[in-house]
Amino acid sequence: MKTHRIAVIPGDGTGPEVIGEGLKVLKAAAKKFKFGLKTKVFPFGGQHYLKTGKLVDEADEAELRTFDAIYLGAIGLSGAGAKYVDPGILEKNILLKLRFDFDQYINLRPVKLYPGVASPITGVSPEVMDYVVVRENTGGVYTGMGGIMMKGTPNEIASQEWVYNRFQVDRCLRYAFELAKKRHTKKAPFRGLSAEAKAAGRTARLTLCGKTNVLTNVFGLWERAAKEMAEEYPTVELAYRHVDAICLLMVQDPGQFDVIVTDNMFGDIITDLGAACQGGLGVAAGGNLNPDKGGVSMYEPIGGTAPDWTGKNGINPIAAIGAAALMIGNLGETKAAEAIEAAIAKTTPKMKTQLAGQMGWTTTQVGDLVAKSL
């Protein structure tokens, strides 16, 4: 029996509550599908920083590297009565530090409408809204290159540089092409393909999101690299859309998307739009991945700490449970991941809404429902 070592960072606010439900479901899956789980809790977060002055250091990272994956709740201090921490301290020294030091170069965000979940898009069905966004996670404008000159004068200049190298682009595209290739088969191709594409042997679609008409250098590189790599994937139809068109179509015609690949900043924007379309942050899960051999990836619910709901047993744990499914699937337990997803799909129709305090169930009861559905 294989045992998976999971580093657990519950974090702040309602993070520990939703992570607790995710672990509950993981343990039920481990029992059913005969694999082991070994977990260790790490206290990183805003409260820990205020108490100890400690963030994440080299020794912490060395220990985290011995685990198979990291399961994260949420980190941050906000809400009434919260003690103040300067903006950027927690983000740069915990979240971004782990992302960059562990080279988690893929941000994976499934956009999936579960049964019974209300989408703001009228008439959309779970069969139509089921795609994945692959966001490059370590480059682009978020690397911090740039600066300010003549600060405080009428001629003050601020710049932020949008930089990519071919290596970063290629490895992100490679992951996206491989994911698209694996999502469908010839017998069950992507439903959005044309008859001509299916006749030509296409089974999947990868859509590159960029802005080649304005950001000609950066997205010229992305487009050129994608077209060259597409020659290696005859079953994957490569499409291109400008980012503004992507936003429009995610609302008007989500069924045309299978896998979307994009850069860091555009990915940051469209993934939150995707979360809204699928019913909100309460159901949106994601992963910061290093898919290379020996890489350690980090999985999390997308919502924040929700401090106003801390300790009230009313926060929605579905996103955290979905993140657990994503994690265990990427660790090789495919059947367990599929079973958890199926259990979520059986649970969401029983919930009144996906909003905190309005689910018709408590946080722990929702976790129980998913675990029992396994």
Predicted features, each with a name:
Residues 2-6:
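Extreme N-terminal starter segment of soluble prokaryotic enzymes
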Residues 116, 241-248:
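Short acidic loop-to-helix transition motifs that present clustered carboxylates
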Residues 22, 26, 226, 320-328, ...:
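Buried hydrophobic packing segments
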Residues 34-58, 250:
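N-terminal beta-loop-helix "entrance" segment that forms/cooperates
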